[in-house]
Amino acid sequence: MAQVACGIDIGGSGVKGALVDLETGEYIGDQVRIPTPNPATPDAVAAVCREVINQLNVKVGVPIGVTFPAPVFGGVIPYMANLDQSWVNVNVDELMERYLGRAVV
């Protein structure tokens, strides 16, 4: 059985997600895209990420990686360009763990 991970890409216009075969790098099944909420506050975007993993039916134990349109240092976003400025100084590790119910990378 293939090793699987879930990737979530948070962008200014959409939050995209897919399951990926870690051995081949290929997508497994459908990809999901949900428009980025407006305003794109941390809680609103995290709720969309939760919807992405629900639509993908990501099983407990499957690792989840999340990308942001900003640098992340020690789990914290120091500045933000494409989303709401309320992201500045948010600990995204804690935010995503709270919304997704598991640790993310």
Where are these regions (language model features)?
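Alpha-helical structural elements of signaling/regulatory helical domains
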Residues: 40, 58-59
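A general structural motif
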Residues: 2, 59-61
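A generic structural signal for short, solvent-exposed coil/turn residues
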Residues: 9, 25-26, 58, 96-98
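Short glycine-rich, Thr/Ser-proximal phosphate-binding strand/loop in the N-terminal lobe
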Residues: 2-47, 77-79
